[in-house]
Each structure stands twice: as C-alpha cells, then as structure tokens.
Design a protein with these regions (language model features):
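Glycine-rich phosphate/pyrophosphate-binding loop
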Residues: 214
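Class I SAM-dependent transferase core
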Residues: 1-82, 90-94, 98, 111-119, ...
C-alpha cells in the first residue's frame, strides 16, 4: 500500500544528502524501509519528506533529517544509544534497527505513554526531564537530541563515553538553529556545525511525575 510512497521518500532523502556532500548508508536506508512511518503519524502522506504534526503540539521530523542524524552518529551494533525527546517514537524505532541498546526519554506523559504502546519492548522508555539524561543507565556511546537547546546540556555531555558522540540542534547567536555534532575525548569535547535546522524547543522539566523506565 505504501511502497511507492516509501520509494519516493528514499529517493528524496538520497537527493538531499548529495546537497550536503553526504551519503546515507545502506543500513540506515534499510532501517527506514523496515520502519512503518504511517504507524507513528496520522496523515494521508506519512512518507512525505517534511515534518508533520503529532499530539501535544509536537512534530515528527522530516524523514531526511531522521536519516541524516542517524547517519552522522555512526552507530555500531554494540553501542548504547540515548534519545532525548521520544515524540512519536519514529526516531527511536529507526535507532532500534541499528543497535539493540536504545533508551528514549519523553517529558510529556501523554506522548510517552502512547509511544510505550507502539515501540518494540526492547526499547527502554522513560517519562522524565530529558535535560538530565538517564544517569542510572549511562554512560552512552551515542546521544541524539530531537529538540533545540540554548546550549548543549552538561548533564548529557557528562553521560557520554570517552569517544562518544552527541547530535543536537542548538541556537546560534543570530537566533537561528544549527544541527551540531559533539565528540567527547579525554573529558573534553568539541563541536562541528552540520546544517541549519528547525526543531521544537528543548524544555527543562517534565509534565507530571517521573514515571521511570518501562
């Protein structure tokens, strides 16, 4: 039913990647093909290459951005990966095709509970404050943040392993948003700007009690 839409999505993703002198690997493309995006968003065109609205005023990211962020993390099957901002659950589902050790945090209980019903049970979920990461389960080899921060949260950097990477949208001095790749080495970190983006803001705190892991 969705085969043509999926093929078109993949072609568009590959086209966008060339504009950024990048290439989306076959393993990421396969993860996109195996993850039914239409289960994560209510839309007549769930595979269109654009962000779409979901519940609670949030969005599901543009497929190219999902693919690009996943690609830039260079995830190995042995890696422990933390996602900040579960949202629809689509990005976490993609990550679960790259490694069996995926953790994801959502601050909005309505979204967190809904995605817990959709996601594979081996994905560890939590309804809590993403700014604080998941200290009890850290450290993590990779962290992906799906909301824009004023600056990279120190708690997340602290929870990266030596040699670990984090991809995160960050506000720049002009008030715009940059997608940034952070690499940690010997308790120091540096960042590389990848592209301009637009995400919902990363909000401190959470709406309700801390539900812990599920």
């Amino acid at each position: 039913m969705y085969e043509e839409q999926i093929d078109k999505m993949i072609n568009t993703i590959n086209h966008h990647a060339t504009r950024y002198n990048s290439k989306i690997s076959s393993k990421v493309i396969e993860a996109l093909r195996q993850t039914p995006r239409h289960l994560f968003v209510e839309s007549n065109t769930p595979y269109a290459d654009r962000p779409l609205p979901i519940d609670c005023g949030q969005t599901i990211s543009q497929p190219f951005i999902v693919a690009y962020m996943t690609e830039m993390l260079d995830i190995d099957p042995s890696h422990r990966v933390l996602e900040i901002g579960t949202g629809s659950g689509y990005q976490a589902a993609i990550l679960s095709h790259m490694t069996n050790d995926v953790y994801t945090i959502e601050r909005i209980p309505e979204l967190g509970k809904k995605t817990q019903q959709i996601l594979n049970k081996r994905i560890k979920t939590r309804i809590s404050d993403g700014y604080n990461g998941w200290l009890e389960e850290g450290p993590f080899d990779r962290i992906i943040v799906t909301a824009t921060a004023d600056s990279p949260p120190q708690a997340l950097i602290d929870q990266l392993t030596d040699g670990g990477k984090m991809i995160i949208p960050v506000k720049n001095p002009n008030g715009n948003e940059d997608l940034v790749l952070i690499t940690k080495k010997n308790d120091k970190w540096d960042s590389t700007r990848l592209m301009g983006v637009r995400f919902v803001p990363l909000v401190k705190g959470y709406k309700g009690v801390d539900y812990g892991k599920a």
